[in-house]
Amino acid sequence: MFGKGGMGNLMKQAQQMQERMQKLQEEIAXMEVVGESGAGLVKVTITGSHSVRRVNIDESLMEDDKEMLEDLIAAAFNDAARRVEETQKEKMAAITGGMQLPPGMKMPF
Protein backbone atom coordinates (compact mmCIF):
# COMPACT_ATOMS: atom_id res chain seq x y z
CA MET A 1 0.00 0.00 0.00
CA PHE A 2 2.72 2.52 0.97
CA GLY A 3 5.65 0.95 -0.84
CA LYS A 4 9.12 0.45 0.55
CA GLY A 5 9.75 3.01 3.29
CA GLY A 6 6.56 4.89 2.42
CA MET A 7 4.97 4.67 5.84
CA GLY A 8 8.24 5.60 7.57
CA ASN A 9 8.67 8.63 5.31
CA LEU A 10 5.08 9.66 5.92
CA MET A 11 5.57 9.48 9.69
CA LYS A 12 8.82 11.45 9.43
CA GLN A 13 7.11 14.18 7.40
CA ALA A 14 4.25 14.35 9.91
CA GLN A 15 6.72 14.72 12.78
CA GLN A 16 8.62 17.47 10.94
CA MET A 17 5.38 19.34 10.26
CA GLN A 18 4.39 19.01 13.92
CA GLU A 19 7.76 20.48 14.97
CA ARG A 20 7.36 23.38 12.52
CA MET A 21 3.83 24.00 13.83
CA GLN A 22 5.08 24.11 17.43
CA LYS A 23 7.81 26.59 16.48
CA LEU A 24 5.28 28.70 14.57
CA GLN A 25 2.89 28.76 17.54
CA GLU A 26 5.70 29.99 19.80
CA GLU A 27 6.72 32.61 17.24
CA ILE A 28 3.15 33.87 16.84
CA ALA A 29 2.57 34.04 20.61
CA UNK A 30 5.68 36.25 20.99
CA MET A 31 4.94 38.63 18.09
CA GLU A 32 3.32 42.03 18.59
CA VAL A 33 0.73 43.57 16.28
CA VAL A 34 -0.60 47.14 16.32
CA GLY A 35 -4.25 47.88 15.58
CA GLU A 36 -5.46 51.40 14.90
CA SER A 37 -8.67 53.39 14.80
CA GLY A 38 -9.61 57.02 14.32
CA ALA A 39 -6.98 57.45 11.59
CA GLY A 40 -4.24 56.37 14.00
CA LEU A 41 -5.38 58.46 16.96
CA VAL A 42 -5.87 55.29 19.02
CA LYS A 43 -3.41 52.40 18.79
CA VAL A 44 -3.55 49.08 20.61
CA THR A 45 -0.57 46.73 20.63
CA ILE A 46 -1.34 43.07 21.31
CA THR A 47 0.63 39.83 21.22
CA GLY A 48 -0.14 36.93 18.96
CA SER A 49 -1.94 35.34 21.91
CA HIS A 50 -4.20 38.44 22.14
CA SER A 51 -2.68 39.91 25.33
CA VAL A 52 -2.79 43.71 25.31
CA ARG A 53 0.71 45.22 25.66
CA ARG A 54 0.03 48.93 25.11
CA VAL A 55 -2.77 51.39 24.46
CA ASN A 56 -1.75 54.73 22.94
CA ILE A 57 -4.28 57.57 22.83
CA ASP A 58 -3.54 60.83 21.05
CA GLU A 59 -3.74 63.84 23.39
CA SER A 60 -6.36 65.49 21.18
CA LEU A 61 -8.88 62.80 22.16
CA MET A 62 -8.60 63.48 25.88
CA GLU A 63 -10.99 66.41 25.61
CA ASP A 64 -13.55 64.56 23.49
CA ASP A 65 -16.55 62.45 24.38
CA LYS A 66 -15.73 59.50 26.68
CA GLU A 67 -18.08 57.16 24.78
CA MET A 68 -16.39 57.97 21.47
CA LEU A 69 -12.98 57.26 22.99
CA GLU A 70 -14.19 53.91 24.34
CA ASP A 71 -15.52 53.02 20.87
CA LEU A 72 -12.18 53.93 19.29
CA ILE A 73 -10.28 51.77 21.79
CA ALA A 74 -12.56 48.81 21.09
CA ALA A 75 -12.18 49.33 17.33
CA ALA A 76 -8.38 49.50 17.63
CA PHE A 77 -8.34 46.26 19.62
CA ASN A 78 -10.57 44.54 17.07
CA ASP A 79 -8.28 45.76 14.27
CA ALA A 80 -5.24 44.35 16.08
CA ALA A 81 -7.00 41.00 16.66
CA ARG A 82 -7.91 40.83 12.95
CA ARG A 83 -4.28 41.51 12.04
CA VAL A 84 -3.12 38.69 14.33
CA GLU A 85 -5.53 36.30 12.60
CA GLU A 86 -4.30 37.38 9.15
CA THR A 87 -0.66 36.94 10.18
CA GLN A 88 -1.41 33.49 11.60
CA LYS A 89 -3.05 32.45 8.32
CA GLU A 90 -0.10 33.73 6.26
CA LYS A 91 2.47 31.96 8.43
CA MET A 92 0.38 28.79 8.50
CA ALA A 93 0.12 28.77 4.70
CA ALA A 94 3.92 28.84 4.49
CA ILE A 95 4.12 25.62 6.52
CA THR A 96 1.16 23.78 5.00
CA GLY A 97 1.95 24.70 1.41
CA GLY A 98 -1.12 26.92 1.14
CA MET A 99 -3.55 24.34 2.49
CA GLN A 100 -6.22 26.30 4.37
CA LEU A 101 -7.57 25.35 7.78
CA PRO A 102 -11.20 24.25 7.81
CA PRO A 103 -13.69 27.05 8.64
CA GLY A 104 -13.87 27.71 12.37
CA MET A 105 -10.58 25.96 13.11
CA LYS A 106 -8.02 28.32 14.61
CA MET A 107 -4.47 28.08 15.82
CA PRO A 108 -3.17 26.87 18.14
CA PHE A 109 -4.71 23.45 17.75
Curated annotation (Swiss-Prot):
Disulfide bonds: none annotated. GO terms for cellular component: bacterial nucleoid; cytosol. Keywords: Cytoplasm, DNA-binding. GO terms for molecular function: DNA binding. SUPFAM superfamilies: YbaB-like. It is found in: Cytoplasm, Nucleoid. InterPro entries: YbaB-like_sf (IPR036894), YbaB/EbfC (IPR004401). Pfam families: YbaB_DNA_bd (PF02575). Belongs to the YbaB/EbfC family. Binds to DNA and alters its conformation. May be involved in regulation of gene expression, nucleoid organization and DNA protection. Homodimer. HAMAP family: DNA_YbaB_EbfC. This is Nucleoid-associated protein VV1_2004. It comes from Vibrio vulnificus (strain CMCP6). The lineage of its organism: Bacteria, Pseudomonadati, Pseudomonadota, Gammaproteobacteria, Vibrionales.
